[in-house]
Each structure stands twice: as C-alpha cells, then as structure tokens.
Amino acid sequence: MHRIIIFATLALAAIPALARDGGQWESQPAAIRQWFLTLMQPDHPRVSCCGEADAYEADSFEVEGDHYVAIITAHRAVSIIPIGTRVPVPNHKMKWDSGNPTGHGIIFVGTQGQVFCYVTPGGI
C-alpha cells in the first residue's frame, strides 16, 4: 500500500502545473499573456509562478544583505497586499532566465504571503 501512495505522489509531482489565468491578463498582448502563463518557479521548474499566487507589480526593489526586497508599486487584478509593502525575496525565488517583456517588476505572492517568484523590472 505504501508503494502505491509513493508512486502516486511521484507521478503527480511530475505533472507540470498550469498557470491560473483569472482574467488579469486578458487586456495584455498575446506575447505577454504567454510569458505569464509559461513562467515557472526557479526552484521548482515544473510549477508555475502564478499557479497558486497573485501577481503584483513591484517596480522598486532594494538589496538587503544577500537578498532582494521587492516593493509593491501597483496592483494587478488583486489588491490584498497594500502598495508600498516590502516583500523579502528568498534568493532561490529570483527569476532570471525568462526575460521580462512587461517593463515592470512582477512578484508572485501566495495567499499565506509566500513568494513564488520575483522578476525584476525589465525592458520591453
């Protein structure tokens, strides 16, 4: 019985997670929507940055010691975290490999405040 549970758990973990589009990107150009939908967590490359999180603009950031601190600068479709909130970003949640076509820093934060990904502001 334990082997079945272990096998089932491993099989489910191997399935790529799909990003959640709650309509927050429908006004965006197709290329930007696709970028959001395919953005994967740096430490879990089969799990979407936004599968269980909400995206916030974080155009400002600071470096404190050895990690980034993202600063919420605007809301997207959600407004749970107030503008100006400083969010410490663990180094393993920094997303460097997918570019950033939005021109904005984007941080994905879960309902319990956990950071899934942070993409620093980039050029369009």
What are these regions (language model features)?
Residues 10-11:
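Short, linear, compositionally biased motifs with a strong N-terminal bias
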Residues 14-16:
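N-terminal signal peptide c-region/cleavage motif recognized by signal peptidases
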Residues 20-71:
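N-terminal secretory signal peptides
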